[in-house]
């Protein structure tokens, strides 16, 4: 699995954030892929591949 860390952070648009408990990322530039495992863990998957690239934020539950 390839890890893809993003140097740019979008406040309020993290994967599994309070506004998107099902793992949706709207208007954040990462697509809107359904990632149920992203909620509560602070990580999600991009729209290119469900298991191709994992983006991790230690403060995703902001």
Swiss-Prot record:
UniProt family annotation: Belongs to the KRTAP type 8 family.
Organ and tissue specificity: Wool.
A Pfam match: KRTAP
GO cellular component terms listed in the entry, alphabetical order: cytosol; intermediate filament
Keywords, sorted A to Z: Keratin, Repeat
Function: In the wool cortex, wool keratin intermediate filaments are embedded in an interfilamentous matrix, consisting of hair keratin-associated proteins (KRTAP), which are essential for the formation of a rigid and resistant wool shaft through their extensive disulfide bond cross-linking with abundant cysteine residues of wool keratins. The matrix proteins include the high-sulfur and high-glycine-tyrosine keratins.
Protein name, per record: Keratin-associated protein 8-1
Gene behind this protein: KRTAP8-1
Chain residue ranges for the region called 12 X 2 AA repeats of G-[YCGS]: 12-53
Assembly description: Interacts with wool keratins.
Organism: Ovis aries
């Amino acid at each position: 699995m390839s890890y893809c860390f993003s140097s740019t952070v979008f406040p309020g648009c993290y994967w599994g954030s309070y506004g998107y408990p099902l793992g949706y990322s709207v208007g954040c530039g990462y697509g809107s892929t359904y990632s149920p495992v992203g909620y509560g863990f602070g990580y999600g998957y991009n729209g290119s591949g469900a298991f191709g690239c994992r983006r991790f934020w230690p403060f995703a539950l902001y």
